[in-house]
């Protein structure tokens, strides 16, 4: 597969305002509420586990190739087309939809890659904020200098998986976000 290196001196953290309209975000939130959410797990060496000291938000996972393709069409001209011997081929169809209520957060962590097979995997997290009527819930990147992203409805955020970050505690209101990944395939097969 593709060998990766992260240069923390110049991390890739990129905002794309207005990726989704307010109406589109409201439809996503309605879909999340209709499906219902469960306590989110974290991946450990022994498998997926609920670890509420690290992560206490809720989520629902939706496998939706059509929505992933629509998101890809919207972002493909704005994101890196190549990384470490791989070319951009799409957006992961596994859409993780997050719900954070007051007191909920996701402590500092790095995101894992989605590995489809030995030739294709994700390299960047692709987040879309579905609302902004809440206090707290910033995405904080622990780089030098620290970067704090205040969510705005419909805004996309892209960053390299290994960058340590957190979703800070919600003080009031409910935060909704959609997370997926940018997928890359190795040139040399």
Q: How would you describe each model-predicted region?
A:
Residues 1-156, 162-189:
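Fe(II)/2-oxoglutarate oxygenase catalytic core
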